[in-house]
Design a protein with these regions (language model features):
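Terminal targeting signals and extreme-terminal segments of soluble enzymes
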Residues: 1-73, 79-138
Length: 138
């Protein structure tokens, strides 16, 4: 299971002093990019390498608030279904589950046309473990 940690910054909070809801998808994206970099599917030196994964859909369930200074841990699981890549996320603050999410992506070429998954992506996904009942709240 891939894990990504980060600390909540002040600018990510709102007038209620909690993380604004729009930031959860950003946190999930950070975790997804870190996952892909670790697996050498994205190259930090080539920003265009990350552009291939177009977002088809997103879902987020907010369970508990996060605040400035909290350290969060995001767990990521991924699978390939045909031409779609599905990512699921669990965000934790200490031992409390604060959010769950799912994003769905497809691979696009420079002309923005749908492409089949690359051999590298297929090989990577064959190694990934997937738990069908992992998300409890979506």
């Amino acid at each position: 299971m891939f894990e990504y940690s980060r600390r909540i910054q002040f600018y990510e909070t709102d007038l209620m002093r909690i993380v604004h809801h729009s930031n959860y998808l950003r946190f999930f994206e950070e975790a997804r990019v870190a996952w892909a970099v670790q697996r050498q599917l994205i190259d930090w030196r080539d920003p265009h390498s990350a552009a291939a994964f177009a977002v088809l859909g997103t879902e987020v369930r907010h369970l508990l608030p996060c605040r400035f200074g909290d350290t969060i841990k995001i767990q990521v699981q991924a699978r390939l279904t045909g031409v779609r890549v599905v990512f699921e996320y669990k965000m934790w603050k200490k031992k409390q589950l604060v959010s769950e999410g799912r994003t769905e992506h497809v691979n696009l070429g420079p002309d923005l046309k749908l492409q089949r998954p690359t051999p590298e992506l297929k090989q990577c996904m064959e190694k990934e473990q997937w738990n069908e009942t992992w998300l409890l709240n979506l």
